Each structure stands twice: as structure tokens, then as C-alpha cells.
């Protein structure tokens, strides 16, 4: 079970975007995340008349390692850690470590 999933709101802990919040839009591999508006780089794209794309400079969100982000707890307004709790029926749910509140699925 992944502790950070697509649709979760996260806050960046390290790097040039430290303190910024964003929503996870994609999980790459097992430990990299693409977050909307975070870790933006400028890519130079060649024009391709076969595909109908024009060339130019495009801003693109690049992956960031999950160890550099933490899930955002809206109740406290701070970054929080994620724990796994086993329910009575055997199912597992994600909870905030600070409060024990269940994290709602996005």
C-alpha cells in the first residue's frame, strides 16, 4: 500500500520549491511523484510538422522523490506523516500519525 497516492495534497520539504503545496497528478515507478505546479523546468521542443506541434520553450513538471514531500493535513494546516491501520474486517486504511484521523481517498 502506497502512503502517498494520486490526488493527495502534499507539501514539499526540501529543494527550491520547499514549502509549496500541490496535488499529486502521477506516480512514476515506485518512488517518484509528479506534482502539479512543483519542480517545473523549461524544455526546448523542436517543431514537428508530422504531429502538428510547434516548437518553443515549454514548462513541464518533472518527477520528485517521495522522500522530499509529506502529505498535507488540512485540519492542522501542517505536513504530517502517514500510518497504516488495520480495520476489524482486515482492510487497511491510511491515517495521519499526529491525530489518527483517517485519510479520505481522493
Curated annotation (Swiss-Prot):
Q: Where is the signal peptide?
A: none
Please, which domain of life does this record's source organism belong to? Bacteria
Q: Which example biological process does GO assign this protein?
A: translation
Tell me yes or no: is Ribonucleoprotein among this UniProt entry's keywords.
Answer: yes
Give the SUPFAM superfamilies listed for this entry: Translation proteins SH3-like domain
The alphabetized UniProt keywords are: Ribonucleoprotein, Ribosomal protein, RNA-binding, rRNA-binding
Task: Read off the PROSITE patterns from this record.
Answer: RIBOSOMAL_L24
Q: Name one GO cellular component term.
A: ribosome
- Identify the InterPro entries for this entry: KOW (IPR005824), Rib_uL2_dom2 (IPR014722), Ribosomal_uL24 (IPR003256), Ribosomal_uL24_CS (IPR005825), Ribosomal_uL24_KOW (IPR041988), Translation_prot_SH3-like_sf (IPR008991)
UniProt keyword Ribonucleoprotein present: yes
Q: In Gene Ontology terms, what is one molecular function of this protein?
A: structural constituent of ribosome
Record Gene3D superfamilies? 2.30.30.30
User: Which family, according to UniProt?
Assistant: Belongs to the universal ribosomal protein uL24 family.
SUBUNIT field: Part of the 50S ribosomal subunit.
- Sorted alphabetically, which HAMAP family does this protein's record hold? Ribosomal_uL24_B
Job of this protein: One of two assembly initiator proteins, it binds directly to the 5'-end of the 23S rRNA, where it nucleates assembly of the 50S subunit.
Q: What is this protein called?
A: Large ribosomal subunit protein uL24
